[in-house]
Swiss-Prot record:
The gene is ddl. Its main location: cytoplasm. Belongs to the D-alanine--D-alanine ligase family. Gene3D superfamilies: 3.40.50.20, ATP-grasp fold, A domain, ATP-grasp fold, B domain. Mg(2+) 1 binds at residues 248, 261. It comes from the Bacteria. It comes from Clostridium botulinum (strain Alaska E43 / Type E3). This is D-alanine--D-alanine ligase. It is found in: Cytoplasm. The lineage of its organism: Bacteria, Bacillati, Bacillota, Clostridia, Eubacteriales. Signal peptide: none annotated. InterPro entries: ATP-grasp, ATP_grasp_subdomain_1, D-Ala_lig_Van_CS, D_ala_D_ala, Dala_Dala_lig_C, Dala_Dala_lig_N, PreATP-grasp_dom_sf. Binds 2 magnesium or manganese ions per subunit.
Length: 301
């Protein structure tokens, strides 16, 4: 089977995508697959460069790669691909839509408001939520242009910065607590990974700089683990995820978990969060890649 590892793209997360793609190419079982690297530099490449492959292994992140666009093109071309379909990908990429769905499904997520470019900032609503709040692009990733705002006077500048990256900006209540991530594979949750950023929160530097954070498989107290697992699986189902996704949460001091967001194409280097989680149940990185391909091939699109 000829597998095209698709990486690069046109989003702000291009460099991270190239790292994920290279790691997959380096680690995939070459005895089992014929592997080609496909670097996307412009949108047309997703049509022009995929000819002749039997399967697209997606290592794209951010807009155009993680928002359902590429998935729709591949589906139209009849090329099987890894991970979630177009609908789930687009819903998870849009933090406003995904939070609306979670709220409707009675899955706990922080209060928020969403702004489009011509909307007035509703300071009264923000005051009701209570400071601090998080301001970030609605369709952004890797915590790019994400700010923790503690006073009303700083809101406007953060919103202006957010609009440099996106057509919509989300303002949500900052939940103080410990961040965890819960990889879901099929209908099962893999081991929980704790994230201990050395900065105030898990920002771009903490995510990608060496030593920016400590990340490790953790064992939660039984009752909390059960609630986290129930929420992760319910979130995966509500947002119609397929094959695998990463559900990020924050757990307060009182052991109350909140859903932060869902990543449908999370980082895939050996040191990324999903491979770390898989290693906790003795699944190697090459084995994880195999599992993703096998499960993706079973999905009827």
């Amino acid at each position: 089977m000829k597998v095209g590892v698709i990486m690069g793209g046109i989003s702000s997360e291009r460099e991270i995508s190239l790292k994920s793609g290279k790691s997959i190419v380096d680690s995939i079982n070459k005895n089992k697959y014929e592997v080609v690297s496909i670097v996307i530099d412009e949108k047309e490449d997703i049509i022009n460069k995929v000819k002749g492959i039997d399967f697209a292994l997606l290592a794209l992140h951010g807009q155009f790669g993680e928002d359902g666009t590429v998935q729709s093109v591949l589906q139209t071309l009849g090329i099987p691909y890894s991970g979630c379909g177009p609908l789930s990908s687009s819903m998870c990429m849009d933090k406003d839509i995904s939070k609306c769905i979670l709220k409707a499904a009675n899955i706990r997520t922080a209060p928020w408001i969403n702004l489009r470019k011509n909307d007035a900032i509703n300071y009264e609503e923000i005051e009701k939520m209570g400071y601090p709040v998080v301001v970030k692009p609605t369709h952004g990733g890797s915590s790019v242009a994400t700010f923790i705002i503690k006073e009303e006077k700083d809101i406007k500048d953060a919103v202006i910065e957010g609009f440099k990256w996106d057509s919509e900006v989300i303002i949500e209540k900052f939940i103080k607590g410990d961040e965890i991530t819960c990889p879901v594979f099929g209908d099962k949750m893999l081991p929980v990974v704790a994230i201990k950023p050395k900065a105030e929160f898990f920002d771009f530097t903490a995510k990608y700089a060496d030593g920016g954070s400590d990340e490790f498989v953790t064992e939660l107290p039984k009752k909390l683990h059960e609630e986290v697992e129930k929420m992760a699986l319910a979130t995966y189902k509500a947002l119609k995820c397929e094959v695998y996704s990463r559900v990020d949460m924050i757990v307060t001091e009182d052991k109350v978990p909140y859903i932060l967001e869902v990543n449908t194409l999370p980082g895939m280097t050996p040191n990324s969060l999903i491979p770390k989680s898989a290693a906790g149940v003795n699944i190697s990185f090459p084995e994880l890649i195999d599992m993703i391909i096998d499960e993706s091939m079973k999905v009827i699109r």
